[in-house]
Every structure is written in structure tokens, then in C-alpha cells.
């Protein structure tokens, strides 16, 4: 499987090199990104696409496309095809999450960034350390698909999302100066909404009588952090599989019985078996929290805000916050 993926990536990189060497005035296929004078922006992942759409809302002549399919979630297993990289090379700007989340695109992005086309949405954000082991604390080992020692899922916290939309607007303004003011104005409106959500999250930790939480995956760490909650354990970090050994499950269950966290947070569409078993063994309830890492291809403009508002209501209910 790894050999096949490597071959696919090498072939795609070769195609991309050919595309980059083509004359800048070479014709593009009808309907391809950048056709008919459009300023096409390619967003790598679903949350980055949501944020980029908000920045580009009602800006004439600008089209935002999504690179990784909307339902993919965390993209570390995604292998782009030659056709995918054709789309990428045709875009006028490429917006990435950054922090190594798009490791599968490292070589193509380096080639494209020679034209300053790549916009890193993580610039100016404050990433959390990557967790290591069941204690949920960062010890600097990082993700296979992220920057060393860093949790790359910054999109999952509204305060960081606000910084991301501002970084996107700044980068797009450099690529398309004629619309820089419109990008900046849209970003400030979106950032204000996200900062409002972050303030609501912070209120939970200020008033909750108990604050312990267990996370199914480390992307939920940003929600827990902004809510002022105390992460007792992280069941899965980075590319780790979701299966817990019986001995690890029993040890975690004993620990949770002793520490009595309020909630085990799983992820939609349903918690994995480890979450259900741990909840059953420890007596700690579980609920689903959505980081908006994936979603519908026709997501509404306020999709991110609605998802985060639902998360806030769930946390308020379990942490006894009115």
C-alpha cells in the first residue's frame, strides 16, 4: 500500500512539474480553475474551504474550490491523483491549513510556492502542543501528518479560526490587491462571529463546577482548551488507530473512575467503539462534538458557526452551565 501510494505521488509530482513548466499563457480546459479570467482560489481542506469562502463572499470574479473531498475529514490518508494536481496547479492561489497537515502535498506546494501562490492560514495562530499518550499533555512528539510537536487542527477552535480567516484575507490581498479591502472586511466580519463563539466557550470553564474531559481524538483539544476544560486523556492522536487494547482500556477505565471526568467527547457521525467501551466500563457519559473537519459539499455559509454553537450547547448541558 505504501509503495503504491509513493508511486502515485511520484507520478503526480512529475505531472505537476510539467504543468509548472508550461507557458503561463497556455490555454486551459473549459471550466478549469482560472478559466474566463476568474481568480480561482483552491482551499485544501473542508474547514479551510469554509473560512476561505467567508473571506471571498460577494467578491466579484473570485471563485473558491475545495481540493480534498468534503467528507474526507483529516486528510493524512488522502492521495491526490494527477487530475487533482492539475486543478491545484491551475489555481491562482492555494490556501492551506499549514502546520504540516497537508504533508501529502509537500512537494507540489513547494513547487507552487515559488510563485507565492500558497497562503498558509496558520500564520499568526497559536497552536497547541501535540499530546503524547493517555495523559493528554503535550510532550513534543507531534503527528505523522503534522509539524513536529504541534497539534495542527487549529480550525477546531473558534479563536484560532478567527486568526486563520485574517491570515487568509491578508494572503489573498497580496495575490489580488484589487480586492484586498473586500477580503479584509469579510474576514473581520467572520472573525467577529468566531470570537463571539470563543467567548461563549470560555464562559463554560469559568462557571463549570467540574472540568475534566476525555477526548476521542486530539483535534478536540482546541475546543476543550477554549472552553477552559481540563483534558484528562486523549484516546487517539495524529494517525494512531482507534482500537484500544484490553489492558489499556481497563487501565483507562480505572483511572477515570478515580479522577471522575465529566464527559468523554467523541466525534460524529458516531463515537468509535473505544469511546463506547470506555464509557460503559468507567461510568463516564459520552457525547459527540464536531470539529467541522468534514461536512456536506453544499455546506451553508454559516455551517462552521452552527456546528460550534451546537458544541457549546452540548458542553453547557454536561458541565452544568446554564
Regions found by a protein language model. Give the residues of each.
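Extracytoplasmic metal-acquisition and chelation regions
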Residues: 2, 23-322
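General helical structural elements
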Residues: 8-9, 32
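Bacterial N-terminal signal peptides
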Residues: 10-23
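Twin-arginine (Tat) signal peptide motif
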Residues: 3-7
Amino acid at each position: 500500500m505504501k509503495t503504491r501510494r509513493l508511486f502515485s505521488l511520484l507520478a503526480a509530482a512529475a505531472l505537476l512539474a510539467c504543468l509548472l513548466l508550461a507557458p503561463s499563457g497556455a490555454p486551459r480546459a473549459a471550466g478549469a480553475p482560472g478559466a474566463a479570467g476568474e481568480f480561482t482560489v483552491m482551499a485544501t481542506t473542508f474547514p479551510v474551504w469554509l473560512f476561505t469562502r467567508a473571506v471571498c463572499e460577494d467578491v466579484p470574479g473570485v471563485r473558491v474550490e475545495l481540493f480534498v473531498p468534503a467528507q474526507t475529514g483529516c486528510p493524512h490518508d488522502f492521495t491526490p491523483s494527477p487530475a487533482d494536481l492539475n486543478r491545484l496547479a491551475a489555481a491562482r492561489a492555494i490556501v492551506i491549513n499549514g502546520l504540516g497537515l497537508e504533508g501529502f502535498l509537500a512537494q507540489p506546494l513547494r513547487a507552487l510556492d515559488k510563485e507565492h501562490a500558497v497562503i498558509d492560514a496558520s500564520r499568526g495562530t497559536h497552536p497547541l502542543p501535540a499530546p503524547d499518550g493517555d495523559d493528554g499533555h503535550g510532550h513534543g512528539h507531534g503527528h505523522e501528518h503534522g509539524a513536529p510537536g504541534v497539534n495542527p487542527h487549529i480550525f477546531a477552535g473558534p479563536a484560532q479560526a478567527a486568526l486563520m480567516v485574517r491570515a487568509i484575507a491578508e494572503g489573498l490581498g497580496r495575490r489580488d490587491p484589487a480586492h484586498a479591502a473586500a477580503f479584509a472586511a469579510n474576514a473581520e466580519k467572520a472573525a467577529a462571529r468566531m470570537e463571539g463563539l470563543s467567548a461563549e466557550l470560555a464562559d463554560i470553564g469559568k462557571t463549570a463546577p467540574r472540568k475534566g474531559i476525555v477526548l476521542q481524538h486530539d483535534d478536540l483539544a482546541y475546543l476543550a482548551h477554549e472552553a477552559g476544560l481540563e483534558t484528562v486523556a486523549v484516546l487517539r492522536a495524529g494517525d494512531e488507530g482507534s482500537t484500544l487494547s484490553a489492558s489499556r482500556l481497563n487501565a483507562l477505565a480505572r483511572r477515570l473512575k478515580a479522577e471522575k471526568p465529566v464527559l468523554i467527547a467523541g466525534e460524529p457521525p458516531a463515537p468509535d467503539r473505544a469511546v463506547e467501551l470506555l464509557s460503559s466500563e468507567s461510568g463516564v457519559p459520552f457525547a459527540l462534538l464536531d470539529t467541522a473537519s468534514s461536512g456536506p459539499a453544499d455546506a451553508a455559509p454559516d455551517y462552521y458557526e452552527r456546528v460550534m454553537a451546537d458544541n457549546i450547547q452540548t458542553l453547557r448541558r454536561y458541565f452544568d452551565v446554564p
